[in-house]
Structures are given as C-alpha cells and as structure tokens.
C-alpha cells in the first residue's frame, strides 16, 4: 500500500508504541507476551492447578476471560450502576476444570476483580499492559471466527450470508483499540456502521447534543478505519461520501452494503496475527524462555515455533473428533478462519476440512453439559512449514484490484490464485448505479468485471521450513486451480451468541 510509510506496523499498534525499529518492536511484543505468560503462571499457582490442568485450553480461556472482565471499565461501571443484573460487580470468575479420580470435574470459581488486576499488573512490571489485554481479545476473536457463523448477524444488517469471509473480528469488543481495528474485516466495519446509522434513523436524538457530537466523531473515525482498508480510489471515494453525509440514512446503508459486496473481489487489507492462548506463553515462560530478550513477532516464525514445542490439552465431548478439535484451535491460533484451505493445509501438512464436515463443537463447555462423559486429548498444533502473515487482501497488479473468492481473506503471504465465481458475485450488482455515487459505483463494477480468477496473488511468495528462521528459501507451492478453498462451504456451525 502506498501509505505504508505513514502507518505504524501492527506490532506497534499491538504494543501501543510509537514508531520503533524492528528490534525494539520485537522486544516490546516479547515483553507483552512474556507478561501474559507470567500472569498465567501466577494464576495457576493461585488456583493450585496441576501442570496438566494448567495446559488445558478451557482453563486458559476462563483465566483470560477473568482478566479481560476485571479490566472492562465500562461494564464494571454499568454493573455498579445497575445492581439488578444479578452479578457482583466486584467479582469475576468462571469454570475451572480439575482432574479428580480419573474424571474431569467442573469447579466454579469467584475472584475479586481488584485481586486479578493486582496479579496482572505485577506480572507486567506494575503497568496496566493494555496491549496484552488486546492480544487476548484478538485470540478470543480468532477462536470465534473459526468456530461460529454470523449468518444471523449478516442478515439482520441487510447483508448476504455469503459475505462471511469479510467478518473477521466481528466479536471483538469496542475497546480493542488500534490493534483490534487492524484485524477487523471489511464486513465487520460495515456492520458496525450500519448498526450506528440504523440507531440514528430510529432515534431522533442520536446525532444531537453533546452526546451526538461524540457519536459523530466515533462515526467518522469508523468510516476512516474502513476507508483505510480499501485499496482502490473509487472505494475510498465512496467512503468519503459516506463519512461526510450530513444525516446518515438509508442511502449510506446502501452504499456500505455495495462496498461490502465489492470487497469480495476488490479485497480490503486486513491484518492477521497469530495470537495464542495464555497457557502457551505461560509454558514457555515457565521453561525459562525470556521473551523480551529473545524478541517475538506475531507475524513471523515465532508463534509457529512456540506451537511446535507446546503441549496443550482440550476437553473432548463423547462424539467429537479430536483431530477436528485440533484443526479448529490451529486455525484460531493463526487467524486462518478465512484463509484458503489449500494454503492452510499445505502449511499445516495435514488436510484441513471445511467447517460443514467437522465433527466438533466449540472449545468452550457450557455450564449445563455433563462432565462425567468428558475426556481430554492433546491438541495437535504443530505445522509442517511456516509462512509470513499478511495484511493485504492479496490483490494483484500493483496492489490494485484483482480476483477474490467469495470466502477468502488471505492470512498467509503465499502465492496462489484466488478462485471465485464471478457470476455469483456480479449478480449482486445488477441495476442500481444511479445517485450521487454513480460514477464510483460504475468504476468499481468495471474493476470487478475485469478481474481474472486465474491471476496469481502474492507472486513468488512461499512457505518456509521451520529450520529456516531467516526466511531465506521460499518454497512456492503449486495448488490445484480448480479446487475451491472455502472453509465455510456447506456450513452447519452454530451461531455466535453473546
């Protein structure tokens, strides 16, 4: 992208830092994940978890959620002002699973938020370490992206469920900052904006008064974030129109839905980061690894290397396939829910199956599920190769517009074609090119029509052996061009429910 020079790298966003050189970035990202690891170890000590229990991904998720809840200022304030919510505003907790007499038992724990905040700060040199919190949010978001479908949310905002590949980060909380904004897909931003506009249509005072001014600033900021994800002048110009509208209404919703559809071929730049469960960082810190000294990157070999050497367990329900559970978590760890399955399978070294064929439900266990029949298994999170994560949509010819597939937002910077059914996508663009954005719409449709599915994206980029940490010998895979690589094909996953 042309503006790359003015942007902070997403590791800098992640660590809240100003412009730094590569070594400083690696050190500050290392400090961030090291802090998560130290916090996790301390929590395991507090809860008296055995080594095995501490490696259980369900326990990791509970501990992560506790610290996120302890630092959720807005919700804490809300709970204090609305005591009828039936929750103690000062406490947080969740299910912890322990091994007793050859069986898994669930124990509900409750902690003072103040205590959790103290442990977190202590693990992070006395700082609030917001970057580490955001990192955990992104890991949860990536897990949701791989596990649940958002058909209902898409339909509610007037979008097409086939646009699911644009929905990365749709469950990220609002407070996830710049690092969170970087990983949100085009569809996620569009959906947030549409919800806002709809509120404005239904509530006369939404844009008025002191509050309305703040709302307006938030609206324009979200528009700018979305504009920054688009890579063609016409799409950006349309975003300017949406942002500058005096009184956003149905015309803007139309424009946004048009833009979301166009992103299926003229893809936006969306960042991808490998965010791992807290227990993985905990294991490394416990074994004496010094993240800050060694440095760490979320987009290079480091997460792959960490997963090669970590043993993480998961609870498995009676009729679930452990290999499928592993696939789900592997995809979440590498933010690969929207990646082409041909590419993911090649990197992982085992075939990755579409979600409709998975015999596994989500990782988290509901409180009403019977623990007597639960088993646990090792998650297979290793990979055959590693590849650099991308933040571009994989558009060819000078990062302009090119082919896209109705269900892919590339994660790995690896050469491939992006197969797509142009007819399916173009069918959505019949007719409406009149109105104030007509010339831009016409231009966008023209670019989409000239896109060729056989064009190669990420020309010359390959995967690397795990021994090749300096990325010197790219191995460029060749893929079967005809094999469509959508994870959401024949989808039957459950909906995401808050």
From Swiss-Prot:
Residue window of motif Bipartite nuclear localization signal: 198-216
Gene Ontology cellular component list: helical viral capsid; host cell; host cell nucleus; ribonucleoprotein complex; viral nucleocapsid
Annotated localization: Virion; Host nucleus
Region (Disordered): 1-21
Keyword presence, RNA-binding: yes
InterPro entries named among the record's database cross-references: Flu_NP (IPR002141)
A GO MF label: structural molecule activity
BP-aspect Gene Ontology terms: symbiont entry into host cell; viral penetration into host nucleus
Keywords, comma-separated and alphabetical: Capsid protein, Helical capsid protein, Host nucleus, Host-virus interaction, Ribonucleoprotein, RNA-binding, Viral nucleoprotein, Viral penetration into host nucleus, Virion, Virus entry into host cell
Motif Unconventional nuclear localization signal, residue range(s) on this chain: 1-18
Entry-linked Pfam families: Flu_NP
Coiled-coil region(s): none
Disulfide-linked positions: none
PTM note: Late in virus-infected cells, may be cleaved from a 56-kDa protein to a 53-kDa protein by a cellular caspase. This cleavage might be a marker for the onset of apoptosis in infected cells or have a specific function in virus host interaction.
Domain of life (superkingdom): Viruses
Family to which this protein belongs: Belongs to the influenza viruses nucleoprotein family.
Oligomeric form and interacting partners: Homomultimerizes to form the nucleocapsid. May bind host exportin-1/XPO1. Binds to viral genomic RNA. Protein-RNA contacts are mediated by a combination of electrostatic interactions between positively charged residues and the phosphate backbone and planar interactions between aromatic side chains and bases.
Function: Encapsidates the negative strand viral RNA, protecting it from nucleases. The encapsidated genomic RNA is termed the ribonucleoprotein (RNP) and serves as template for transcription and replication. The RNP needs to be localized in the host nucleus to start an infectious cycle, but is too large to diffuse through the nuclear pore complex. NP comprises at least 2 nuclear localization signals that are responsible for the active RNP import into the nucleus through cellular importin alpha/beta pathway.
Protein name: Nucleoprotein
Organism this protein belongs to: Influenza A virus (strain A/Chicken/Hong Kong/YU562/2001 H5N1 genotype B)
Gene that encodes it: NP
């Amino acid at each position: 992208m042309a503006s790359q020079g003015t942007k902070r790298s997403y590791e800098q966003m992640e660590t809240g830092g100003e412009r730094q050189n590569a070594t400083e970035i690696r050190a500050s990202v290392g400090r961030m994940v090291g802090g998560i690891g130290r916090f996790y170890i301390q929590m395991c000590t507090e809860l008296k978890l055995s080594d095995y229990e501490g490696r259980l991904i369900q326990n990791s998720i509970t501990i992560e959620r506790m610290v996120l809840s302890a630092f959720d200022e807005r919700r804490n304030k809300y709970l204090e002002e609305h005591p009828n919510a039936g929750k103690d505003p000062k406490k947080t907790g969740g299910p912890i699973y322990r091994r007793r007499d050859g069986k898994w038992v669930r124990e509900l724990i409750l902690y003072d938020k103040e205590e959790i905040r103290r442990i977190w700060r202590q693990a992070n040199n006395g700082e609030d370490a917001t970057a580490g919190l955001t990192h955990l949010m992104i890991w949860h978001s990536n897990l949701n992206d791989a596990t649940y479908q958002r058909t209902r949310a898409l339909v509610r905002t007037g979008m097409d469920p086939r646009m699911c590949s644009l929905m990365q980060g749709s469950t990220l909380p609002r407070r996830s900052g710049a690092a969170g904004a970087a990983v949100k897909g085009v569809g996620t931003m569009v959906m947030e904006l549409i919800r806002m506009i709809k509120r404005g249509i239904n509530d006369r005072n939404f844009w008025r008064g002191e509050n309305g001014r703040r709302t307006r600033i938030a609206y324009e900021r979200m528009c700018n974030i979305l504009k920054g994800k688009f890579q063609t002048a016409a799409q950006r110009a349309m975003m300017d129109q949406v942002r500058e509208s005096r009184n956003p209404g149905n015309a803007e919703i139309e424009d946004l839905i048009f833009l979301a559809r166009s992103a299926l071929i003229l893809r936006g730049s969306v960042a991808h980061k490998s965010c791992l469960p807290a227990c993985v960082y905990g294991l490394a810190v416990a074994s004496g690894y010094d993240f800050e000294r060694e440095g760490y990157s979320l987009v290079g070999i480091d997460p792959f290397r960490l997963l090669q050497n970590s043993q993480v367990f998961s609870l498995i329900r009676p009729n679930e396939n452990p290999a499928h559970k592993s696939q789900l978590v592997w995809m979440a760890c590498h933010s690969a829910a929207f990646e082409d399955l041909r590419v993911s399978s090649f990197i992982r070294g085992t075939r990755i199956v579409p979600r409709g064929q998975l015999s596994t439900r989500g990782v988290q266990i509901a409180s009403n599920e019977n623990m007597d029949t639960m088993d646990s298994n090792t998650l297979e999170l290793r990979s055959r190769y590693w590849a650099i994560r991308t933040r571009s949509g994989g558009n060819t010819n000078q990062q302009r517009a090119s082919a896209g597939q109705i269900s892919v937002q590339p994660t790995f910077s690896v050469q491939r074609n992006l197969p797509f059914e142009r007819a399916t996508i173009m069918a959505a663009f019949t007719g409406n090119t009149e109105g104030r954005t007509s010339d831009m719409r016409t231009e966008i449709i023209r670019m989409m029509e000239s896109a060729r599915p056989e064009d190669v994206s990420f020309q010359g980029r390959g995967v690397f052996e795990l021994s090749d940490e300096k990325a010197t010998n790219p191995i460029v895979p060749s893929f079967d061009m005809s094999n469509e690589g959508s994870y959401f094909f024949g989808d039957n996953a459950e909906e995401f429910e808050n």
